[in-house]
């Protein structure tokens, strides 16, 4: 009887965890060309006096989806991001199973962004108005428990706003 109860409890917890994962909105467009996505974001950001933040990851990454959800729901973070950045979700899929073209695109993307995959996912790449990499942020430093720390995330974004960067020039 105890064994059946343990099995039932384990299955219930697994089902709950799977549903929680599915509840997060999938924010990565897997059909868009990431290079074009970055170029379009740079054009828009430059016109608005903003920088671009590339959140590199994929719909396969629970922490990537958690961060997108966090930014959307935390009003202070959302305002800081929308006032200073063009935030884009850049899909990364290096697997050969996705096709040779996809693997080649992934390699070119990593080269363009300064090889941010070495930090894990999600990883954030801040680009200035010219498209130059200014900073690569390891997301593990922004985590707190099973989510993200508002204080740490705001510190990261506030340190890389156009105003913060340009005041030091």
Question: What is each model feature region?
Answer:
Residues 32-34, 77-106:
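Thiol-based oxidoreductase modules, predominantly thioredoxin-like and allied folds used
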Residues 34-52:
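A short beta-strand-turn-helix
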Residues 64-82:
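Typically the conserved alpha-helix immediately C-terminal to a functionally engaged Cys/Sec
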Residues 48-62, 87:
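Short active-site neighborhood of thiol/selenol oxidoreductases, capturing the structured segment around
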Residues 112-166:
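Non-catalytic, surface beta->alpha helical segment in thiol-disulfide oxidoreductase systems
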Residues 61-64, 124:
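The canonical Cys-X-X-Cys-His
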Residues 1-22:
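Bacterial Sec-dependent N-terminal signal peptides
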Residues 18-32:
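N-proximal helix/coil linker or "cap" segments that precede and/or mark the start of modular domains
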């Amino acid at each position: 009887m105890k064994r059946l109860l343990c099995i039932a409890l384990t299955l219930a917890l697994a089902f709950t965890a799977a549903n929680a994962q599915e509840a997060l909105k999938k924010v990565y467009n897997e059909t868009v060309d990431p290079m074009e996505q970055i170029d379009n974001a740079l054009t828009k950001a430059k016109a608005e006096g903003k920088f671009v933040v590339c959140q590199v990851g994929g719909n396969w990454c629970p922490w990537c989806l958690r961060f997108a959800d966090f930014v959307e729901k935390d009003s202070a973070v959302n305002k800081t991001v929308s006032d200073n950045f063009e935030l884009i979700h850049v899909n990364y899929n290096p697997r050969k199973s996705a096709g040779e073209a996809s693997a080649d695109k992934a390699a070119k993307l990593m080269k363009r962004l300064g090889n941010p995959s070495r930090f894990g996912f999600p990883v954030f790449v801040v680009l200035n108005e010219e498209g130059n990499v200014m900073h690569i942020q390891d997301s593990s430093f922004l985590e707190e428990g099973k989510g993200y720390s508002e204080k740490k995330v705001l510190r990261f974004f506030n340190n890389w706003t156009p105003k913060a960067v340009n005041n030091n020039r």
